[in-house]
A protein has these predicted regions:
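Enzymes that bind and transform nitrogen-containing heteroaromatic metabolites
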Residues: 1-164
Length: 164
């Protein structure tokens, strides 16, 4: 199964200048819980934006067109197809961004773990549009803004009803 893990603003933004335009502590814990023990697939820019590399307890697979790219703790894939081969036989792989990588895997994704952030923000990276007719919501949980959080948010799990 191919899953996406993403935090998305009300206007579809997932990033700004190589980082997240918000801070939500409990969402970072949820991200860790969802991805722990699974291969995480990301683009080079997402890899470079991580405060700690590699993400511990997970295979870190970085998709990049840079033939000379190497980084300790990262397995490198030149294409989505190569990343899929590296993940062959695993029950679930988690695609964690960025925008270009989400677009490349979009026809193949089975599940979305979304954190919908109750903000409209400026940003330079966006999440693909989610068509309601393609997805069935299996879980929804509202969280009000905590003291150290930027905003309230809703945690959702959506499963694709039919593949493209």
């Amino acid at each position: 199964m191919i899953s996406y893990v993403a935090a998305v603003s009300k206007n579809g933004v997932i990033g700004r200048e190589g980082g997240l335009p918000w801070h939500i502590s409990s969402d970072l814990k949820r991200f860790r819980d969802i991805t722990m023990g699974k291969p995480v697939v990301m683009g080079r820019k997402t890899w470079e934006s991580l405060p700690r590399r590699p993400l511990p307890g997970r295979r870190n697979i970085v998709i990049t067109r840079r033939r000379d790219f190497a980084s300790e703790g990262a397995e490198v894939a030149a294409s989505p197809e190569e990343a899929l081969r590296l993940c062959a036989g695993v029950p679930e792989m988690a695609v964690i961004g960025g925008g270009e990588i989400y677009r490349l895997f979009w026809p193949l994704v089975d599940r979305l773990y979304l954190t919908e952030v109750d903000l409209e923000v400026d940003g330079d990276t966006h999440f693909p549009a989610v068509s309601p007719g393609e997805w069935r919501e299996t879980e929804r949980e509202l969280h009000l803004k905590a003291e150290r959080d930027t905003a309230s948010f809703t945690l959702r799990i959506l499963d694709r009803m039919t593949k493209k």
